[in-house]
């Protein structure tokens, strides 16, 4: 029997992280398998496992590795299916494995989650499979609800223990009027007329691409060009959860029925965290190098708390984000899968970009 998800460990010592993934998949009733194969010490085994797994119908691969964590990228080089990377903290607080996984070269696109976040890898795999499976989506909603309830319960417990003389419990007993801050920023950003971009607020598309600032328009253009090549329908909008929070949330609500979102942002990249807080489907994050060479944006995108993963690609790597979209949607769409395989197999992947 073929599992839907295959977890590949670079070493047996990574099992403790993989158990977090397996626990989530068990809870969500998703079939999975497990192999141990090192990208460096048993390269042929990785190759054979991935090629055979793809042939027999595995839909999602998860690579778990530490140190120079090249395993997820090697997996991606042998399959057109989506690959999720879980960097493991073995040394340098896991930063070495995080960078090795997320900065994978095009076209071996990898969806990276936070360091040691095996649980988020399981949730991301479920979100990918849930695009075409209502039962998985229902189970995911229940899981997200349990995470929300934990937050409310923890507040009640902590407040009940506070005995300060000046402590006053602030009750939320009225609705807060919706009001955007810095509305002039919204007018400035949305005044740009970008040729060839779909900006019709069309909720009947497959992908919603959201850019937080015109500063990163080149990254967005790369994504949109490749989506056009793969004939994947998409919407594009420039809006910020910081400058225009109400406009932003309204837009997410309008687009809630799309199959996946892409958030593009720099600095403290709040955009992807804001998207994933409002919806329960796949969110791909593209960090941009506005400051600190993009390291600030990368870390604020990828290291999400339990329950809310962001499928993060490399810094300024719009091309890998677009290819990851193709890998994900190709599971559910034969034409996209065929087009994607042809481009990769012929080593002609978007050579004009």
What are these regions (language model features)?
Residues 9, 36, 65, 86-89, ...:
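Short beta->alpha connector loops at strand-helix junctions that form conserved
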Residues 21-27, 50-51, 77-80, 127-128, ...:
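Short, solvent-exposed amphipathic alpha-helical segments in soluble enzyme
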Residues 2-41, 198-241:
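Glycine-rich phosphate/diphosphate-binding loop of Rossmann-like nucleotide-binding domains
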Residues 2-4, 28-31, 56-59, 79-82, ...:
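Short coil/turn connectors at secondary-structure junctions
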Residues 3, 9-14, 20, 94-204, ...:
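C-terminal binding/interaction regions
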Residues 14-19, 43-45, 65-74, 92-95, ...:
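Short glycine/serine/threonine-rich phosphate/pyrophosphate-binding segments
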Residues 44, 48-87, 249-287:
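Glycine-rich phosphate-binding loop
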Residues 67, 78-106, 278-306:
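Glycine/small-residue-rich loop that forms an oxyanion/phosphate-binding "nest" at active or ligand-binding sites
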């Amino acid at each position: 029997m073929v599992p839907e998800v295959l977890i590949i460990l670079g070493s047996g010592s990574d099992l403790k992280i993989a158990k977090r993934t397996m626990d989530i998949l068990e809870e969500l009733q998703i079939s999975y398998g497990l192999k141990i194969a090192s990208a460096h010490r048993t390269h042929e085994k990785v190759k054979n496992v991935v090629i055979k797994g793809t042939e027999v119908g595995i839909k999602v691969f998860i690579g778990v590795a530490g140190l120079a964590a090249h395993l997820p990228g090697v997996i991606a080089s042998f399959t057109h299916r989506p690959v999720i990377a879980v960097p493991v903290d073995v040394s340098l607080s896991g930063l070495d494995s995080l960078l090795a996984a997320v900065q994978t070269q095009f076209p071996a696109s990898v969806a990276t989650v936070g360091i040691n976040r095996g649980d988020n890898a399981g949730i991301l795999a479920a979100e990918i499979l849930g695009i075409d499976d209502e039962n998985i989506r229902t189970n995911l909603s229940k899981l997200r609800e349990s995470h929300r309830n934990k937050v409310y319960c923890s507040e009640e417990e902590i407040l009940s223990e506070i005995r300060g003389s000046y402590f006053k419990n602030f009750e939320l007993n009225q609705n807060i009027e919706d009001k955007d801050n810095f509305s002039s920023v919204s007018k400035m950003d949305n005044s740009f007329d970008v040729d060839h971009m779909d900006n019709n607020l069309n909720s009947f598309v497959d992908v919603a691409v959201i850019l937080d600032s015109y500063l990163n328009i080149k990254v967005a253009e790369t994504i949109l060009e490749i989506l056009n090549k793969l004939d994947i329908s998409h919407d594009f909008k420039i809006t910020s959860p910081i400058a225009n929070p109400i406009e932003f949330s309204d837009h997410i609500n309008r687009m809630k029925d799309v199959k996946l979102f892409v958030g593009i942002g720099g600095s403290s990249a709040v955009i992807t965290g804001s998207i994933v807080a409002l919806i329960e489907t796949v969110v791909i994050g593209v960090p941009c190098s506005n400051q600190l060479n993009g390291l600030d944006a990368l870390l604020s995108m990828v290291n999400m708390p339990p329950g809310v993963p962001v499928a993060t690609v490399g810094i300024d790597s719009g091309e890998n984000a677009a290819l990851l979209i193709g890998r994900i949607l190709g599971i559910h769409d034969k034409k996209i899968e065929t087009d994607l395989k042809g481009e990769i197999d012929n080593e002609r992947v978007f050579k004009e970009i």
